[in-house]
Amino acid sequence: MRLTLQHINRLKVLLHLAGFLPLLWLILSVDQGWFSADPAKDIQHFTGRMALKLLLATLLVTPLARYGKQPLLIRCRRLLGLWCFFWATLHLVSYALLELGLDHLALLGKELISRPYLTLGIISWLILLALAVTSPQIMMRKLGSQWQKLHNFVYLVAILTPIHYLWSVKTLSPQPILYALAALILLLLRYKKFRQWWR
């Protein structure tokens, strides 16, 4: 069945809910004390995983549209990318406020430089910021051919963020490995595009 614009509009509503409802759950979890004895870490990990899930979902759109012969699915990619940036920003803010605290925010720059996994994280966030700012149609028209070159940096984010996650956990568990494998598979699906860049 070929998806229509009506289907896509309904899908967008569901995707907005998928991006927003976890925020309500996060707020409720904090209010009800559902987290562990270290809620600051739990919040950081939850927001980080949400950003990574949405990044992977964003990267999945193009293969689904291409191999499923559903070109209108591409219209969902920007929405997912913006939700990814939203959760990545919450992840950064949660680290700055809950790990360092308001009294030690001045140390943020030093922390980002001295800890390699944080360096990868902030590089990824800065790229996502650039992609979010330039995502509207008006920016696409202004940047012309440079727009696609800029937005290809999402693949760098797909490499850096799983490494950031793997590096940040003290005890290696299956979860970050699975995210890294998922990112690798999605990147391999675009190998033809990468080959064109390297020629």
Swiss-Prot record:
- Required cofactor names: FMN; heme b
Q: Which UniProt keywords apply?
A: Cell inner membrane, Cell membrane, Electron transport, Flavoprotein, FMN, Heme, Iron, Membrane, Metal-binding, Transmembrane, Transmembrane helix, Transport
Molecular function in Gene Ontology? electron transfer activity; FMN binding; heme binding; metal ion binding; oxidoreductase activity, acting on diphenols and related substances as donors
Indicate yes or no for the key word Transmembrane: yes
Q: Where in the cell is it found?
A: Cell inner membrane
Which InterPro entries does the UniProt entry name for this protein?
Answer: Fe3_Rdtase_TM_dom, MsrQ-like
Topology in the lipid bilayer is annotated as: Multi-pass membrane protein
**Lineage: superkingdom:** Bacteria
Any one of the GO CC terms: plasma membrane
The record's comment on cofactor binding reads: Binds 1 FMN per subunit. Binds 1 heme b (iron(II)-protoporphyrin IX) group per subunit.
TM spans, by residue?
13-33, 79-99, 120-140, 147-167, 169-189
Biological process terms from the Gene Ontology for this record are: protein repair
| UniProt subunit comment | Heterodimer of a catalytic subunit (MsrP) and a heme-binding subunit (MsrQ).
Membership in a protein family:
Belongs to the MsrQ family.
Job of this protein = Part of the MsrPQ system that repairs oxidized periplasmic proteins containing methionine sulfoxide residues (Met-O), using respiratory chain electrons. Thus protects these proteins from oxidative-stress damage caused by reactive species of oxygen and chlorine generated by the host defense mechanisms. MsrPQ is essential for the maintenance of envelope integrity under bleach stress, rescuing a wide series of structurally unrelated periplasmic proteins from methionine oxidation.
PANTHER family given for it?
PROTEIN-METHIONINE-SULFOXIDE REDUCTASE HEME-BINDING SUBUNIT MSRQ
Q: What is this protein called?
A: Protein-methionine-sulfoxide reductase heme-binding subunit MsrQ
